[in-house]
């Protein structure tokens, strides 16, 4: 099966595609030369995709400027130019199906494919539908989604298929070869442990609250792994020069093998991006979510509230974050085993362990 995947800008648009590609190859459905990822040169995909050995092409496009509407004339012009580039790629590659995950590049690629009567589908990872996917919902053959709230935003009900996030299945496979990373970090594998992180680059608000809470956390009968993010690591280390923050806290720039570490955690403190949530629910890890307020349509807050409603997460809005509610939330999970187990079961109930296979099934059904 020849497939064009398209999406970009953020990891939430890229990682589901990478998970599907991995599964297509594992099952022998598509060889490497039958798979193409179309993104932009400036997006995160331009680094991640080629590094994974996946064929990659780019088209030039930009998003709408909400602060300066007059600049959107250029955006519209670029969109129509991008559809011409998309048509050329489609004619040359001759895909059996085109799948988009969001981002403006997917808008051009999937729209043009639909106009050419090539089978098309989209996948929405968040609880709030992005602009590109909302637009494409009218034209595609199928709409795959993760959160029920997202499904409500699409009027095309017959096209909807609940598949979950493909990253769920991938992360389950990645952690099968268990290694005890806590032991490698000099921690006690028998003690309750919380992982605190804000993504690969880190999150300023999470790092700030950790700095304010360290003296209280060092007294606790549990362990903390704090991944500051590569961007903030040096500044955090500088602020902690000469500070005794205890033996129960390990500070790292980032976690290299996150899928291997997550199953060992009693609890995780994190942002609430779609990819992270897919990982947590696949593994049934209780989470304290601090949604980023700096995202389109506040979708991280809505993602987080969906988990909290299901009993799988505690949510602390960034504006409400203080050392008292931060530490007490961690205590609530790590010092109450019954509550932690209930959260874990609620989280697992939301996960879809065969999400990639479910998306591939839809691809096979509509492919020409």
Swiss-Prot record:
Q: Does the keyword Disulfide bond apply?
A: no
Q: Name one Pfam family in it.
A: Glyco_tran_28_C
GO terms of molecular function:
undecaprenyldiphospho-muramoylpentapeptide beta-N-acetylglucosaminyltransferase activity
Does the record bear Cell membrane in its keywords? yes
Please report the record's description of how this protein sits within the membrane.
Peripheral membrane protein
**GO biological-process terms attached to the record:** carbohydrate metabolic process; cell division; cell wall organization; lipid glycosylation; peptidoglycan biosynthetic process; regulation of cell shape
Question: Keywords on this record?
Answer: Cell cycle, Cell division, Cell membrane, Cell shape, Cell wall biogenesis/degradation, Glycosyltransferase, Membrane, Peptidoglycan synthesis, Transferase
Please give the catalytic activity noted in the UniProt record.
Mur2Ac(oyl-L-Ala-gamma-D-Glu-L-Lys-D-Ala-D-Ala)-di-trans,octa-cis-undecaprenyl diphosphate + UDP-N-acetyl-alpha-D-glucosamine = beta-D-GlcNAc-(1->4)-Mur2Ac(oyl-L-Ala-gamma-D-Glu-L-Lys-D-Ala-D-Ala)-di-trans,octa-cis-undecaprenyl diphosphate + UDP + H(+)
Q: Which residues bind UDP-N-acetyl-alpha-D-glucosamine?
A: 10-12, 126, 200, 255, 300
Q: Superkingdom, according to UniProt?
A: Bacteria
Identify the pathway.
Cell wall biogenesis; peptidoglycan biosynthesis
Q: What is its EC number?
A: 2.4.1.227
> Top enzyme class of this protein?
transferase
Q: Where in the cell is it found?
A: Cell membrane
Q: Name one GO cellular component term.
A: plasma membrane
Q: Give the function comment from the record.
A: Cell wall formation. Catalyzes the transfer of a GlcNAc subunit on undecaprenyl-pyrophosphoryl-MurNAc-pentapeptide (lipid intermediate I) to form undecaprenyl-pyrophosphoryl-MurNAc-(pentapeptide)GlcNAc (lipid intermediate II).
NCBIfam families associated with the record:
murG (TIGR01133)
* Alphabetical list of HAMAP family matching this protein: MurG
Q: Which family does the record assign? A: Belongs to the glycosyltransferase 28 family. MurG subfamily.
Q: What is this protein called?
A: UDP-N-acetylglucosamine--N-acetylmuramyl-(pentapeptide) pyrophosphoryl-undecaprenol N-acetylglucosamine transferase
Please give the organism: Lactobacillus acidophilus (strain ATCC 700396 / NCK56 / N2 / NCFM)
The protein's gene is named murG
